[in-house]
C-alpha cells in the first residue's frame, strides 16, 4: 500500500486548538469493524459501550514539559525538544537552531540562562545533551520547560495545558506527547466504569516526538518506526488472561496502549511462549494486514492524514471502513487530533 492511500482532505477549522471545557464533553463516533456501521454520539456513551467483565487498558505515561528555549554560548538562539531522558543528567533531543550545534558546544537553557549544558554527541537527527548542574533533568524541565503541544495546535502553550494536555491517571513521567484518547476520561467516568464491573489496567509507553514525524516513503512497507520505551507489567498480563478466560473484551484506550500490548504479544510469538511481561523499546509498526493478538476494541482520537496511526486504525477496523468513517467525521464536523473528538471501534473479525 502507498502512503497516499491514507490521505483525506481536512479543513483547517476542524483541527481542535483547545480542549472542550469538560473532558467528557467531546463527541464519540462508533465504528463497527465488521459491518462498517457508524453511530454518532458523545463520549459519555463509553459507559454503555463497555460491558461487565471487560478490561480497559490505559497508558499511564506523564507528559513532561519537554520544550526548552535557550542559546548557544556564541549567542545563537535555539529550541530543544526532549525525545527521551537517558539518565538523570542527560537527554536525547531535537534541536532547532540556525546551525546544528557541534559536539562540545556549550548551551544555556532557560529565559535567564538558568542551566548550563554541553552538546556531547549527535545520533542521526537527535542530539545528546548533558546538563552540568546537580539538578536532575526532570526538575530542570519542571522549572524552565514548556508543555510540548503538537505542531498542528499552532499556538504557544498556556497554563491550562499543564492540566489538560495530561490524563487524570498519569503516573510515570517520560512522554513528550499525550496519549490523547485518555484525555477524555475524568475521575467520575472512571469510577462509573469500575462500578459497572469493568476492570482497569495500566501499561506505560513514553510517547516520543517521532509520533508527529511524517511518513517519508511512498510505499508504507519501507517505513521504519522510531523507538519508544514500553512497560507491560505482570498485573496486566494476568488481567488479560483473566479477561479472555471469562469471555470479556480487551478495550485499548489509545493507539499507544495498542502498540504496548501488541509489542508484548509479538515478543511472546517470536519466543514461542505465552504472553509475558515486556519491558523495553518497541518499534512496532501496525498497518493493514497485521493480525491483532490481544485487542478487541479501541478508543482513539482522529489522526493525521497519511500518519502511521490512521494505518493502525485501518488494520483494526478495515481500510475501507476506516476511510469511510473519516469522510463521515469531516462531513459531520468532528474535531480532529489531540484536543479533538474520539472513536470507539470494534475490531474487524470477518473480512469485508
From Swiss-Prot:
Disulfide bonds: none annotated. Keywords: Cytoplasm, Queuosine biosynthesis, S-adenosyl-L-methionine, Transferase. Its EC number is 2.4.99.17. It holds the Pfam family Queuosine_synth. One of its GO terms (molecular function) is S-adenosylmethionine:tRNA ribosyltransferase-isomerase activity. GO terms for cellular component: cytoplasm. It catalyses: 7-aminomethyl-7-carbaguanosine(34) in tRNA + S-adenosyl-L-methionine = epoxyqueuosine(34) in tRNA + adenine + L-methionine + 2 H(+). The keyword Zinc-finger does not apply. GO terms for biological process: queuosine biosynthetic process; tRNA wobble guanine modification. Its main location: cytoplasm. Pathway: tRNA modification; tRNA-queuosine biosynthesis. It is found in: Cytoplasm. The keyword DNA-binding does not apply. InterPro entries: QueA, QueA_dom1, QueA_dom2, QueA_sf. Belongs to the QueA family. Monomer. Transfers and isomerizes the ribose moiety from AdoMet to the 7-aminomethyl group of 7-deazaguanine (preQ1-tRNA) to give epoxyqueuosine (oQ-tRNA). This is S-adenosylmethionine:tRNA ribosyltransferase-isomerase. It comes from Vibrio cholerae serotype O1 (strain ATCC 39541 / Classical Ogawa 395 / O395).
Amino acid at each position: 500500500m502507498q502512503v497516499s492511500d491514507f490521505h483525506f482532505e481536512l479543513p483547517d477549522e476542524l483541527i481542535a486548538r483547545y480542549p472542550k471545557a469538560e473532558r467528557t464533553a467531546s463527541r464519540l463516533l462508533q465504528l463497527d469493524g465488521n459491518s462498517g456501521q457508524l453511530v454518532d454520539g458523545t463520549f459519555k456513551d463509553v459507559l454503555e459501550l463497555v460491558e461487565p467483565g471487560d478490561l480497559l487498558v490505559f497508558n499511564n505515561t506523564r507528559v513532561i514539559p519537554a520544550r526548552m528555549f535557550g542559546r548557544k554560548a556564541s549567542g545563537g538562539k535555539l529550541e530543544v525538544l526532549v525525545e527521551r531522558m537517558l539518565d538523570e543528567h542527560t537527554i536525547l533531543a531535537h534541536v532547532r537552531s540556525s546551525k546544528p550545534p557541534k559536539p562540545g558546544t556549550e548551551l544555556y537553557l532557560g529565559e535567564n540562562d538558568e542551566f548550563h549544558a554541553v552538546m556531547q554527541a549527535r545520533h542521526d537527527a537527535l542530539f545528546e545533551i548533558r546538563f552540568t548542574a546537580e539538578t536532575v533533568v526532570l526538575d530542570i524541565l519542571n522549572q524552565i520547560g514548556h508543555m510540548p503541544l503538537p505542531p498542528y495546535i499552532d499556538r504557544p502553550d498556556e497554563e491550562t495545558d499543564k492540566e489538560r494536555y495530561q490524563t487524570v491517571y498519569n503516573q510515570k513521567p517520560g512522554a513528550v506527547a499525550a496519549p490523547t484518547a485518555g484525555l477524555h476520561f475524568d475521575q467520575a467516568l472512571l469510577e462509573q466504569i469500575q462500578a459497572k464491573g469493568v476492570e482497569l489496567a495500566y501499561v506505560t509507553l513514553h510517547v516520543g516526538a517521532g509520533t508527529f514525524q511524517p511518513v517519508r516513503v511512498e510505499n508504507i512497507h519501507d517505513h521504519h518506526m522510531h523507538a519508544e520505551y514500553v512497560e507491560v507489567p505482570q498485573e496486566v498480563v494476568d488481567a488479560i488472561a483473566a479477561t479472555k478466560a471469562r469471555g470479556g473484551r480487551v478495550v485499548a484506550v489509545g493507539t499507544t496502549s495498542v502498540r504496548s500490548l501488541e509489542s508484548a504479544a509479538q515478543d511472546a510469538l517470536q519466543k514461542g511462549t505465552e504472553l509475558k511481561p515486556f519491558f523495553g523499546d518497541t518499534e512496532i509498526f501496525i498497518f493493514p494486514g497485521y493480525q491483532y493478538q490481544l485487542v478487541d476494541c479501541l478508543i482513539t482520537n482522529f489522526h493525521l492524514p497519511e500518519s502511521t496511526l490512521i494505518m493502525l486504525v485501518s488494520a483494526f477496523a478495515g481500510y475501507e471502513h476506516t476511510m469511510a468513517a473519516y469522510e463521515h467525521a469531516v462531513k459531520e464536523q468532528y474535531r480532529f487530533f489531540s484536543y479533538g473528538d474520539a472513536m470507539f471501534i470494534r475490531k474487524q473479525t470477518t473480512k469485508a
